[in-house]
């Protein structure tokens, strides 16, 4: 009888609610974020833009057009051209409103991956983060972005960790992340490979892929030993991890 070592157990990644539990509630709304927390997400993910008067607001697109409800008083417009007062009149699906980043960070019981969609918003985001109570869940948040200059501003002015979003994992992306002092890299799950994940981990960075919504994508994420799983459906990922990892 020969001695055979057992394979190392798969680590259990943290579940990140992508725009909240956006499979079950209107994306990037307080309802979606609450649902994600109820469904077992350990972190939330949101997108932020600047309003015309400098308010950091939570929305993915540059305009309200795609997510606005059909009966909204205001149905079209760019976030950067609308004031906070105008955005307050916008009605989203399910009767939800456009939240501010401050509102989300006040209500959350978990850290947030805050995606800065435009580099110009970085300073305002930094000011909000700096003002957070040290012991609050939101104080453990991470800023993520495709814009290296936005992440550099966050690193320069706050103690908040950052994760560099990339379309492809290569030597240049890893080098940029290290130069930024980033805690991780966030590639699309569609381009993630075991070789890429190993290179990121060897560089001392976390692997934070997006967006995992199918069984094949989940299997890739687990095989790559990712640190977080960003998904539209935290409850589904929770069930899958329970079955696969116990």
Regions found by a protein language model. Give the residues of each.
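Conserved N-terminal beta1-alpha1 strand-loop-helix module at the mouth
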Residues: 8-60, 68-72, 126-128
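Active-site beta-loop-alpha junctions enriched in small/polar residues
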Residues: 20, 49-53, 61-62, 117-119, ...
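Conserved, mostly hydrophobic/aromatic
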Residues: 18, 36, 47, 87, ...
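Alpha-helical segments flanking ligand/cofactor-binding loops in enzyme cores
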Residues: 30, 34, 102, 152, ...
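Metal-dependent phosphodiesterase/phospholipase catalytic core, i.e.
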Residues: 12-13, 60-161, 165-167, 203
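C-terminal active-site rim and adjoining tail of enzyme catalytic domains
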Residues: 91-98, 163-246
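N-terminal amphipathic alpha-helix/helix-capping segment at the start of soluble metabolic enzymes
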Residues: 1-17, 152, 198
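Hydrophobic faces of well-ordered beta-strands that scaffold small-molecule active sites
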Residues: 15-17, 44-46, 112-114, 141-144, ...
């Amino acid at each position: 009888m020969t001695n055979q070592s057992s394979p190392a157990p798969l680590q259990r990644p943290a579940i990140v609610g992508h725009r909240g539990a956006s499979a079950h509630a209107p994306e990037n709304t307080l309802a979606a974020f609450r649902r994600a927390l109820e469904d077992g997400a350990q972190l939330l993910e949101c997108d932020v833009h600047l309003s015309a008067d400098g308010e950091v607001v939570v929305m993915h697109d540059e305009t309200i057009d795609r997510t606005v409800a059909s009966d909204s008083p205001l149905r079209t417009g760019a976030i950067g051209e609308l004031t906070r007062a105008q955005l307050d009149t916008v009605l989203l699906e399910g009767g939800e409103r456009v939240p501010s980043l401050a509102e989300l960070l006040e209500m959350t019981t978990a850290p947030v991956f805050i995606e800065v969609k435009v580099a110009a918003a970085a300073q305002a985001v930094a000011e909000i983060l700096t003002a957070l109570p040290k012991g609050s869940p939101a104080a453990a948040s991470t800023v993520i972005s495709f814009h290296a200059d936005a992440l550099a501003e966050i690193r320069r002015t706050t103690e908040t960790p950052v994760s560099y979003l990339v379309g492809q994992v290569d030597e240049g992306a890893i080098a940029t992340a290290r130069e930024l002092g980033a805690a991780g890299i966030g590639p699309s799950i569609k381009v993630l490979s075991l070789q890429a994940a190993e290179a990121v981990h060897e560089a001392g960075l976390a692997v934070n892929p997006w967006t995992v919504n199918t069984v094949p994508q989940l299997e890739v994420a687990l095989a790559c030993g990712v640190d977080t799983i960003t998904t539209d459906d935290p409850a589904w990922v929770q069930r899958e991890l329970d079955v696969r990892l116990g």
